[in-house]
Amino acid sequence: MGMKINAELPLPAELKAEYPLSEEILRIKEKRDREIRDIFTGKSDKFIVIVGPCSADNEESVCEYVSRLAAVNDRVSDRLMLIPRIYTNKPRTTGEGYKGMLHQPEPDREPNLLEGIIAIRRLHTRAIRESGLTAADEMLYPENRSYLDDILSYEAVGARSVENQQHRLTASSMDIPVGMKNPTSGDFSVMLNSVKAAQSSHRFIYRGMDVTTDGNDLAHVILRGGVDKYSKCIPNYHYEDLIRLLDMYRNRDLKNPAAIVDANHSNSDKQFKEQIRIVSEVLHSRNYNTELKGLIKGVMIESYLEEGCQRIDENRVYGKSITDPCLGWEDTERLIYKIAEEC
């Protein structure tokens, strides 16, 4: 047999009972969820900034980052909705490399999924408690989101997962916004089809149960660029791309048309400093066209305490990415204030 059982994992309800949320955290989440919903339904004109490390690799540095973000939030909350990006599981192009805190609570040690599910719940809970900001994470494994579904205020379905039926159907069960990224090919139709699926009701098997979902009216798109058959990056944040997306939304019966622009990945060709320019161009396009201003609800930025990235070894720099390169804190802070002025 090609698979062995390493450990029996607790059910989500059991983990939640062991690591419960305080009444204060529940109040924070309820308030922020309501404010974020108002942005996606058009009741609020605040601009969303989903910002944080490529991967949440260390509890201390991530919580320090989020606490710094909270201080910035105090100055921009009248214009912006800051959502910390706390990604605890990472898709890998070849399946090799660091797969996130869920797999490896300590990046330089062997995977331990039992310790991992505890570590990610503890991290998200601590981040909210210390900052007052609920976070975004990626739904890489649909069944595992049940360990965090009472904590998160935003989830994303990645470029390699967006065509997968289980991801689409699970997204239809969420009561928070879920961003469906364009696939690595860059195909807008595939992306919008995934939004349609996520907004619809479905009956399917989930964690050993026969379930029926209501559909998620806050499902929307995330533009992250694509690659052609020669692996050359194809950005999709330019004005013409946004107008094309607007036209395609018009031709589909979708609720609450909305888009988030991911300033990194194939939009920047992983040239992390380009995120500053890309965000500026997106803001210019929104301000130039009132319909785009209604469609483009926010941006996604990869940033950490220290800029760039590093290899996993014993001499790691605190607060520096061990996956894709990120903006450093000083650039991030300046960029957020600039967004608040221009959005």
Describe the residue ranges of each PLM region.
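N- or domain-start disorder-to-order transition segments that initiate the globular core
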Residues: M1-T41
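Conserved, mostly hydrophobic/aromatic
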Residues: G52, V261, G328
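Short acidic, Gly/Ser-rich segments with clustered Asp/Glu that frequently serve as metal-coordination loops
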Residues: C54-D57, N256, N264-K270
